[in-house]
């Protein structure tokens, strides 16, 4: 098992992110249940086309499910919803509220992750007190419309060599390239469409974990 935050609840090899639009008409709650049953222990709630009230209802339910499974629950962007549902943490983008200000709102016990796309952003994330960073997008991706150009494996190599805090590799990671990501030093990989769009989510997760094991041999 790979560690993102040793000794904390944020501890896993795969980091799953929700997206209703990619879930084959399965509800986000159904998807989360399948993820947890398949052994996923970090789930980020990222929904762009729902009302705040709908997102809060989802997150209250997901928090209960993840708590029962001893899994970590992260809310994307919405600090208010993260606080109201008592999520384990929040994940921020470069254009979201500053990490240090969010820390004042959610407290020292909660996890704050920050997406980064360059060495400068990674270093600033550390200075501002992020608990972990997202590293990517490593490959082309259509999951997010407002994503920057791929930072490529070279940025991952830089992070592995220079950054001491935990990080999550993300962006265009698939079954066919996850071994490359692991071999370049990533301990945790975030995936969206590769998991959510699979007809059989537990089977896809099993296949991904087999690929990760092969990367270590």
UniProtKB/Swiss-Prot annotation:
Protein's pathway: Cofactor biosynthesis; thiamine diphosphate biosynthesis; thiamine phosphate from 4-amino-2-methyl-5-diphosphomethylpyrimidine and 4-methyl-5-(2-phosphoethyl)-thiazole: step 1/1
Any one of the GO CC terms: cytoplasm
Top enzyme category: transferase
Catalyzed reactions per annotation: 2-[(2R,5Z)-2-carboxy-4-methylthiazol-5(2H)-ylidene]ethyl phosphate + 4-amino-2-methyl-5-(diphosphooxymethyl)pyrimidine + 2 H(+) = thiamine phosphate + CO2 + diphosphate; 2-(2-carboxy-4-methylthiazol-5-yl)ethyl phosphate + 4-amino-2-methyl-5-(diphosphooxymethyl)pyrimidine + 2 H(+) = thiamine phosphate + CO2 + diphosphate; 4-methyl-5-(2-phosphooxyethyl)-thiazole + 4-amino-2-methyl-5-(diphosphooxymethyl)pyrimidine + H(+) = thiamine phosphate + diphosphate
A single GO molecular function term of this UniProt record: magnesium ion binding
Classification via NCBIfam families: thiE
Positions with a binding annotation for 2-[(2R,5Z)-2-carboxy-4-methylthiazol-5(2H)-ylidene]ethyl phosphate: 141-143, 172, 192-193
Enzyme Commission number(s) from the entry: 2.5.1.3
Coiled coil: none
Function of the molecule: Condenses 4-methyl-5-(beta-hydroxyethyl)thiazole monophosphate (THZ-P) and 2-methyl-4-amino-5-hydroxymethyl pyrimidine pyrophosphate (HMP-PP) to form thiamine monophosphate (TMP).
UniProt: 4-amino-2-methyl-5-(diphosphooxymethyl)pyrimidine binding residues: 44-48, 76, 115, 144
Requisite cofactors: Mg(2+)
Keyword set includes Coiled coil: no
Entries under Pfam families matching the protein: TMP-TENI
Alphabetical list of InterPro entries matching this protein: Aldolase_TIM (IPR013785), ThiamineP_synth_sf (IPR036206), ThiamineP_synth_TenI (IPR022998), TMP_synthase (IPR034291)
Family: Belongs to the thiamine-phosphate synthase family.
Keyword Zinc-finger: no
Organism: Lawsonia intracellularis (strain PHE/MN1-00)
GO biological process, one term: thiamine diphosphate biosynthetic process
Keywords assigned by UniProt, alphabetized: Magnesium, Metal-binding, Thiamine biosynthesis, Transferase
Record text on cofactor binding: Binds 1 Mg(2+) ion per subunit.
PANTHER family reported for this sequence: THIAMINE-PHOSPHATE PYROPHOSPHORYLASE, THIAMINE-PHOSPHATE SYNTHASE
Binding site for Mg(2+): 77, 96
Protein name stated in the entry: Thiamine-phosphate synthase
């Amino acid at each position: 098992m790979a560690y993102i935050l040793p000794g904390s609840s944020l501890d896993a090899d795969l980091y799953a992110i929700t997206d209703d639009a990619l879930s084959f008409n399965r509800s986000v709650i159904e998807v989360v249940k399948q993820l947890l049953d398949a052994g996923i222990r970090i789930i980020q709630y990222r929904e762009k086309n729902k009302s705040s009230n709908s997102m809060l209802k989802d997150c209250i339910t997901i928090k209960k499910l993840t708590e029962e499974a001893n899994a970590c629950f992260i809310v994307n962007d919405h600090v208010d919803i993260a606080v109201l549902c008592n999520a384990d943490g929040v994940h921020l983008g470069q254009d979201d509220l500053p990490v240090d200000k969010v820390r004042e709102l959610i407290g020292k016990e909660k996890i704050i992750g920050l997406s980064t796309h360059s060495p400068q952003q990674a270093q600033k994330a550390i200075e501002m007190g992020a608990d972990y960073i997202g590293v990517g997008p490593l490959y082309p991706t259509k999951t997010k419309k407002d994503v920057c150009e791929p930072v490529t494996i070279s940025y991952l190599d830089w992070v592995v060599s220079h950054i001491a805090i935990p990080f999550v590799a993300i962006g265009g990671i698939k079954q066919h390239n996850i071994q490359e990501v692991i071999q370049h030093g990533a301990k945790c990989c975030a995936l969206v469409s590769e998991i959510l769009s699979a007809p059989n989510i537990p089977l896809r997760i099993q296949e991904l974990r087999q690929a990760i094991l092969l990367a270590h041999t």
